[in-house]
Amino acid sequence: MKKILIIGLGLIGSSIALGIKKAHPEFEILGSDREEVENIAQKRGIIDSKVELVKGAQEADIIILAVPISVTLELLKQIATFDLKDGLLITDAGSTKSEIVELANQLFSGTKVKFIGGHPMAGSHKSGVMAADLNLFENAYYVLTEESQELRELLKGLHAKFIILDAKEHDKVTGQVSHFPHILASTLVWQSDDYAKEHPLVKHLAAGGFRDLTRIAEADSLMWTSVLLSNPEITLERIENFKKHLDEIALKITKRDSQAIEHFFEEGKKIRQAMEIHKGALPNFYDLFISVPDEKGVVLRVLALLQDFSITNIKINEENREDIHGQLQISFKRAEDLQEAREIIEKATDFTVV
């Protein structure tokens, strides 16, 4: 019987465990975490048994590290000192890859232990073992730093989209689309809070646009500190690049260059619309935003058009904003459903759909 050791039974680790158990009920899932977390995971059937780190690592055929980056680095150093099985495969679930892969390659060079970096690009506003979700990774990108049929087979129950990406390129890409946006969100919150000291209405008038831009500022502070310190060069380079773009639009405003400013927004809109927005560290939904009039029955009218679809979530934005009258957000699990729903709504109504 193949034994899988999962170290870290939070949202990611426990959700991975559920996916493995679904696809491979014959495998034994060992779990290592704090005792109270292990007990919950075992009681809920997420793991088959709890195990002490050394014993579990020595018995395991595959080890999955689902812990913060700094902890992953320390665990790799510990595990490398254990008497491990020949052919052991180790992977992780960290948000950066270069530092982890480089250390693992140093530690296991010349051994029969194989390390392949992993990054399931999925998450939730919930956390911990109680938030374990079998469907968390469905249709989400799952990055591997090397091709591995063994990992693909192990994790097939997650129904994720596996892509192979060099560790350094991974950190460059995620540095732009994942790490840097968290800096922007928190910076905007800090800036607004500071500005509100002289202009108190800032906090009252911050509406949908501000909320959407800053939502990720509520993310785990310890985790994101670890992420940034594991990818500092790319992070700093992206900050400098962003300063350059801000300076460019500032110059356009200074010159009162309306044509250039309009081009700035128009091109930004086109680029955004052309992007295939997938899940990053957020729920794996494909969101449709519908601007609707403030009329009785309008929401039911839209939902009636979509009665044959599998809808993951519905959110009604009741705020009155100068740029959007009212907004209905409908989330789908599949991109195909989103596109079909968009076409149906655009054909049956005159509502703006984005």
Curated annotation (Swiss-Prot):
Q: In which pathway does it act?
A: Amino-acid biosynthesis; L-tyrosine biosynthesis; (4-hydroxyphenyl)pyruvate from prephenate (NAD(+) route): step 1/1
Where do the Prephenate/arogenate dehydrogenase domain residues begin and end?
A: 2-283
Where, in this chain's numbering, is NAD(+) bound?
3-33
Pfam families, alphabetically? Answer: PDH_C (PF20463), PDH_N (PF02153)
Which cystines does this chain contain? none
Q: Which GO terms describe its molecular function?
A: NAD+ binding; prephenate dehydrogenase (NAD+) activity; prephenate dehydrogenase (NADP+) activity
What is catalysed by this protein? Answer: prephenate + NAD(+) = 3-(4-hydroxyphenyl)pyruvate + CO2 + NADH
- Report keywords, A-Z: Amino-acid biosynthesis, Aromatic amino acid biosynthesis, NAD, Oxidoreductase, Tyrosine biosynthesis
Entries under InterPro entries matching the protein = 6-PGluconate_DH-like_C_sf, ACT_dom, NAD(P)-bd_dom_sf, PDH_C, PDH_N, Preph/Arog_dehydrog, Prephen_DH
A GO BP term here is: tyrosine biosynthetic process
- Per the UniProt entry, the Enzyme Commission number(s) are 1.3.1.12
The family database entries (Gene3D superfamilies) matched by this protein are listed as:
6-phosphogluconate dehydrogenase C-terminal like domain, NAD(P)-binding Rossmann-like Domain
* Domain spans labelled ACT: 287-354
Would you say which domain of life the source belongs to?
A: Bacteria
Family to which the UniProt record says this protein belongs: Belongs to the prephenate/arogenate dehydrogenase family.
Q: What is this protein called?
A: Prephenate dehydrogenase
Specify the species: Lactococcus lactis subsp. cremoris (strain MG1363)
Lineage, uppermost ranks: Bacteria, Bacillati, Bacillota, Bacilli, Lactobacillales
